[in-house]
């Protein structure tokens, strides 16, 4: 595929704005990501070209994380500083993306987590199909650290996190939340709805996660991000991304055992 493309069929001649500020979710915002960031336009262009060559799926979060599309990067034009990517399968999610001022791109080519942020995008036609155009990001973050490699937990037999010090509205304490995915550094929890007391930065000191054969592990968690996902049945699912804090080596070793077990089970199913 030719890596240059025409932008004469755009609905507007204005360039999408380039965002300012540091990257945030889905990576933990407390992490110092500067040493993992590429800022050279040439280096950024080369890395995005590798993503195109690898033909990997890219998730684009828009509308403050409330909407997302799955896409693939199509082409890069270093001269104009733009790149093109496929439109998503959902018309509503595509409309949300067009209205969004800040969009987060996340993918994992060759096991290397890549994240970058763009400003508004524009719709146009690429090779006869609907696509989007955006300015190249000012920086791209690459992470190859294992604590960010999350693996989804079994759907049929979900594992749970018991947040013993969660204050319920009726004055009681404690809530049990299914774990959607987990890594050495944190996990995503599924909420029963829009519930209070889960503000960003909130820390719960008295939690336990039930990991079946591995056992129950005591953990402390900090709420790092919130996400509303559209499920296949059309219903919304609310999740919070949590980071483990004050984690000791015993808990980390047990987590590593559980994640390795999930990876083995997944490979067995694929064989």
UniProtKB/Swiss-Prot annotation:
Domain of life from the UniProt record:
Bacteria
In its keyword annotation, does this UniProt entry include Nucleotide-binding? yes
The family line of this record is:
Belongs to the YcgR family.
UniProt cross-references to InterPro entries, sorted A to Z: PilZ_domain (IPR009875), Split_barrel_FMN-bd (IPR012349), T3SS_YcgR (IPR023787), T3SS_YcgR_PilZN (IPR009926)
Instruction: Offer an example of a GO molecular function term for this protein.
Output: cyclic-di-GMP binding
- What organism is recorded for this protein? Laribacter hongkongensis (strain HLHK9)
Its lineage opens with: Bacteria, Pseudomonadati, Pseudomonadota, Betaproteobacteria, Neisseriales
The protein here is known as Flagellar brake protein YcgR
Please list where the region (Disordered) is annotated: 1-29
Biological function: Acts as a flagellar brake, regulating swimming and swarming in a bis-(3'-5') cyclic diguanylic acid (c-di-GMP)-dependent manner. Binds 1 c-di-GMP dimer per subunit. Increasing levels of c-di-GMP lead to decreased motility.
Looking at the UniProt record for this protein, which Gene Ontology cellular component terms does it annotate, in alphabetical order? bacterial-type flagellum basal body
This chain is encoded by the gene named ycgR
Polar residues bias spans? 1-14
Q: Where does the PilZ domain start and stop, copy by copy? A: 144-260
Xref: Gene3D superfamilies: Electron Transport, Fmn-binding Protein, Chain A, predicted glycosyltransferase like domains
Q: How does it assemble?
A: Monomer. Interacts with the flagellar basal bodies.
């Amino acid at each position: 595929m030719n890596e240059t493309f025409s932008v004469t069929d755009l609905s507007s001649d204005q360039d999408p704005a380039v965002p300012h500020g540091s990257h945030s979710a889905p990576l933990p915002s407390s992490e110092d990501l500067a040493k993992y960031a590429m800022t050279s336009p040439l280096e950024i262009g080369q890395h995005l070209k590798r993503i195109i060559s690898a033909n990997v799926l890219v998730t684009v979060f828009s509308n403050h994380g409330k909407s997302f599309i799955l896409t693939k990067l199509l082409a890069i034009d270093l001269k104009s500083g733009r790149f093109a990517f496929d439109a998503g399968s959902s018309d509503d999610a595509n409309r949300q993306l067009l209205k969004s001022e800040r969009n987060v791109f996340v993918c994992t080519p060759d096991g290397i987590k890549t994240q970058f942020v763009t400003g508004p995008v524009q719709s146009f036609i690429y090779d006869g199909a609907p696509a989007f155009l955006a300015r190249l990001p000012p920086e791209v973050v690459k992470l190859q650290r294992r604590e960010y490699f999350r693996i989804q937990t079994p759907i049929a037999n979900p594992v749970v996190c018991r947040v013993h010090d969660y204050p319920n509205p009726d004055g009681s304490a404690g809530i049990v939340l299914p774990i959607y995915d987990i890594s050495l550094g944190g996990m995503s929890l599924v909420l029963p709805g829009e519930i209070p007391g889960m503000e960003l930065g909130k820390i719960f000191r008295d939690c336990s996660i039930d990991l079946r054969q591995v056992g129950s592990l005591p953990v402390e968690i900090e709420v790092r991000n919130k996400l509303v996902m559209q499920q296949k049945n059309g219903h919304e699912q609310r999740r919070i991304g949590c980071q483990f804090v004050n984690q000791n080596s015993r808990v980390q070793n047990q987590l590593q055992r559980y994640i390795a077990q999930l990876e083995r089970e997944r490979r067995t199913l694929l064989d």
